[in-house]
Amino acid sequence: SKMRGFQQGAVPGEEYEEFGRDKEEAIKVAKILEEAGCDLLNADNGTYDAWFWAHPPMYMPLACNLPEASFLKPHVSIPVACAGRMEDPDQAAEALAEGHIDAVGIARQFLCDGLYLDKIRDEKIGDIRPCIACHNGCFGVYRYKGEPGNLPKTPLGRCALNPVTFQEEKYCLKQAEQKKKIAVIGGGIGGMEAARLMALQGHEVDLYEKSDELGGVFIAAAAPSFKEKDRMLLLWYKNEMKKLPITIHFEEDVSPSMLDTLGADEIIVATGATPRVLPIPGIDLPHVIEAIEYLNKDQTTGLNVVVVGGGLTGCEIAYDLALQGKKVTLVEMLDDILKVKDLSAANSNMLRELIRYHAIDVGLEAPLLSVAPDHVVIGTKDGEKIISCDSVVLSVGYTPNALVSADSKQRIHLLGDCEQVGNLKDVIWAAYDLCVGL
């Protein structure tokens, strides 16, 4: 069950006393099921108290349930399947060939790419759109303090990266009757998705990126060690840009005055967002860095770090710092961390347990008041508190960075964070809503 207690899950590598079903009981249950006539056992770990084992997020290693599934196999004569991040073709094939399991259980990867098996069969592994284990589209049931549990705004069983899943008619791509010249400003995920969709419909697409690399802020988002699937997704998008007839203009910083010179029938602006700036004393000191600067490794941190902001990015940065052996304090002005709607409880629960396991200090209802060279001052219910540190990482959100305003007469469309800051699902689904039939 991977339980330390009621509503207490164990994380990989943690030593603990099993509170729920242990291996011995699992053997007994498996034999009972076999005797009752079951044809196959689909084995994984977890309970609702350790939900992240049954629905593993990106913080969980690939094939996380394979050791326990293979343990069960010798005790029954019926086939044993293993589920839980088993989508790596080589890893799955090896587990089958070596007799550890009899079958592989895969669900989310098929939502993300329905041609998953066909691409493996055709030896086109690089063409597979990878599931990043975000749960934002398929299982976004969320909970946090003040919100005991709620359903996401979209139905379950969808995919953040592939809006076509269960919406084939709504998002059916057809060849355009009239070919248009399309200019896409910004080479992040939103810009690349828009360029991809417009090219697939037969339009002539030019993509303008101000830097020398595609990816935008997602390059930083994919940087932590546990985001290997994010990096694979970024590579997938770059490969799609190469495969499709899209002209990419690198180091082209398009200004509003240049839009009329592009000769485009439609202009899609996907210029992203910029970090929010806190107007507090000491915020401009050299040891204070933005989240994106930390993730891009533009600046290193010391050994004693305060992370400001307990949203998803701030918590992931705190975890990433802890993995490096840093002493981390996480401060959040709200009464709970990870107060993010549609963030699956599987993801948030595991991240909370990782923060606990790595002894990351968490201060709630603790707004940042000032920064000094060797400490920060936060607010508390009783007044103020000084926290010693040698580095401060700010993760306090973003503000839209719209190049221009949307203009239907000039056929200018805003897409993604430059219009409204959101997550990966928000920008990809918005791209489909905008581009299909444009």
Residue ranges of each PLM-predicted region?
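Short acidic, glycine/proline-rich loop/turn micro-motifs
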Residues: 7-12, 52-56, 217-223, 280-282, ...
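Flavin-dependent oxidoreductase catalytic cores
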Residues: 1-185, 189, 193-200, 205, ...
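Rossmann-like dinucleotide/flavin-binding elements
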Residues: 176-209, 214, 249-266, 270-280, ...
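Short, hinge-like loop/turn segments at secondary-structure boundaries
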Residues: 58-61, 99, 121-124, 223-227, ...
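Hydrophobic alpha-helical scaffolding
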Residues: 16-23, 58-62, 82-85, 106, ...
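Rossmann-like dinucleotide-binding cores of NAD(P)H-dependent redox enzymes
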Residues: 204-244, 320-366
